[in-house]
Amino acid sequence: MKEQIEELKRYAVRLKSGNNNLGSGVLWKPKLCQKHKLYVFTAAHVIKNHEDIRVEFERDGKKVELPADEFIISSQYQKEGEWWDVAIIPIDYNYQELPRYRVAELSYDLNKILKNPQLVMVGFPQEGYIDKSFRLSMDTLECEYEDVDKSIETIKYKFVVPNIDNSDKNLELGGFSGAGIFTQIDSEIVLLGIHKGALGENAARGNLLGATADFIRKMCHENNCDTPEKPGEVNGNL
């Protein structure tokens, strides 16, 4: 998985409002682009009740900054801490060379995930913010898959990074909310979900939660967005 991290950085999104860093997100490029050319998946609590939201990502070593003219928040999400914590930002920006990746379907992929539970996300922790460098403000968080509750469409995973001070885990994880959670299946990079936050108010035990890719797909379909293909409908080209 480590050799794929450089590729994953291409999809990493920072969300801002004015001078405030709101959190992270992940770019997704649909196969046919029938509705929009690109989408950002993020956590609903990252952008809800904010105005003048901007999307930032890197292309060819340069930062691209675009306005989030519209966004869709899950109708099942009401306030921070609740389940179904997903938002979608459609973007009409032409990024032809951006490779597509597959979005997981748990009923199809779970057995392989259990055999290879390593996960990784790329986000923008608040403690790592560098004003002059978008690239160096990115950071990675390696995790291991733990479990899923399909009734609330939520996955549980545990971070395995050894260099986070146990007393400061809540602080150091701030800003990762909304980042894409990726796994590797048969050498293919696959989006497993969207990072929500720590389990409870204290992250000291390392338990984290995220919305499943299945819920992202369902939300895209219900809101007339381009919908991620199911396994067998697209081949990863990372």
Model-predicted segments: where are they?
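C-terminal cap/linker of serine protease catalytic domains
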Residues: M1, L192-L238
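Protease-domain processing segments flanking chymotrypsin-fold serine proteases, especially trypsin-like
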Residues: M1-Q34, K218, K230-L238
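Short Gly/Pro-enriched turn/cap motifs at secondary-structure boundaries
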Residues: E3, K16, Y77-K79, K169-E172
